[in-house]
Amino acid sequence: MEGRVSSVGSPHSFLNAPVLFRGPVEPLVFLANFALVLQGPLTTQYLWHRFSTELGYNGTRHRENCGNQSADPLMKEVETLTSHWTLYMNVGGFLVGLFWSTLLGAWSDRVGRRPLLVLASLGLLLQAVVSIFVVQLELHVGFFVLGRALCALLGDFNGLLAASFASVADVSSNHSRTFRMALLEACIGVAGTLASLLGGHWLRAQGYANPFWLALALLIVMALYAAFCFGETVKEPKSTRLFTLRHHRSIARLYVVPAPEKSRMHLALYSLAIFVVVTVHFGAQDILTLYELSAPLCWDSKLIGYGSAAQHLPYLTSLLGLRLLQFCLADTWVAEIGLAFNILGMVVFAFATITPLMFTGYGLLFLSLVTTPVIRAKLSKLVSESEQGALFSAVACVNSLAMLMASGIFNSIYPATLNFMKGFPFLLGAGLLFIPAILIGVLEKVNPHPEFQQFPQSP
């Protein structure tokens, strides 16, 4: 069974509330990412059309006339504004989440995973409410930044992922952990694919508001599930203060205090590897919608939806590929294969000027996401059972920093390179991916069979 009911003595009343059933964590991740992906491309398109209206840009979106718009200065200004406001939203979320995600993740090692899951669910719900107000009332787009910051204050999606991965580590065996991590990431992908397909068609039919209302409804269901249906996986939750430096010190100890079961070098270098992988992933994701909206592709909302769905399919295909490749290859070499396909996909995106070539790039990414579950599993096995929350909150911090770097690098380079090579950020991403490929290979050669921490089998 995935979870266990919280014990008496938990610090908050909802911890002591009886659960309706001992549910797994995967539905929470599915609902959260469905809601986020439903909102993400729509927010980018809303910003694009909002700035187009304000600047008086009326360029046709029909592909047959698209080539004539490539030199339009108004279109370039719309692209630049959209890119910059995407950056502002990500910076706002990072600056708040850097402190809170790490604090809450380490806190969950003592009080249990459920409090963090509930708080993160409420934060995502609050962000959706703010987005609805912006779209319905045509408020200043700066309120998107406010909603993002409020979400980060309660843990954000990174906090939810930290608690979710720690929950999986709590109950998985050493042998099954890599696949369980990949299964959790597959929930992200399936949700993203379905939300992308729905969002593109729905936008064409009914505009921006209704998809945001659906996201709000899903997040309400998610918050209720976290509070009353998720089965706690920490064996003995205990009451503890939230506002104490002890939680942050527990994260620092992971990397600076020697222990028999872990190598500080492996922890640091695997963290660097996942940092680079996440930076490239989210950097490319940040500019892909904008890249597809503008010349020479000029995709409409329907094609944007198909592209976003294709972007999330690797979560599922990577899960299947990981399961098959594990029969004949070590996890390390599965990760290397994933990085190779990721590099190929980035290179194709860089030179894609027609729709079939863009979808070829998406197709080459079918194994691109086997790398992150492998690294997460290796990190999880390097620390003790009581440090999983601290570890994954550290990984959440790495993710937040990577997302900020991704926004800063890709959203700054993209408008700066429009005049000489629009796809240059994708080439940069392909080059950066050689760093984790080298790190993972070197760590395997230096210590091919590290003494990972062995957890007891879950009942």
Swiss-Prot record:
Residues 1-25, 109-112, 155-177, 228-266, 326-331, 377-388, 442-459 are cytoplasmic. The chain crosses the membrane at residues 26-44, 83-108, 113-135, 141-154, 178-203, 209-227, 267-289, 303-325, 332-351, 356-376, 389-414, 423-441. Belongs to the major facilitator superfamily. SLC46A family. It comes from Mus musculus (Mouse). Highly expressed in duodenum, especially in duodenal mucosa, the main site of intestinal heme absorption. Expressed in the retina and retinal pigment epithelium. Weakly expressed in the kidney. Not expressed in duodenum before weaning or in placenta. Weakly or not expressed in brain, heart, lung, skeletal muscle, testis and neonatal liver. It comes from the Eukaryota. The modification Phosphoserine is found at S6, S458. This is Proton-coupled folate transporter. Residues 45-82, 136-140, 204-208, 290-302, 352-355, 415-422 are extracellular. One of its GO terms (cellular component) is endosome membrane. InterPro entries: MFS, MFS_trans_sf, Sugar_transporter_CS. It catalyses: folate(in) + H(+)(in) = folate(out) + H(+)(out); (6S)-5-methyl-5,6,7,8-tetrahydrofolate(in) + H(+)(in) = (6S)-5-methyl-5,6,7,8-tetrahydrofolate(out) + H(+)(out); methotrexate(in) + H(+)(in) = methotrexate(out) + H(+)(out); pemetrexed(in) + H(+)(in) = pemetrexed(out) + H(+)(out). Gene3D superfamilies: MFS general substrate transporter like domains. GO terms for biological process: folate import across plasma membrane; folic acid transport; heme transport; tetrahydrofolate biosynthetic process.
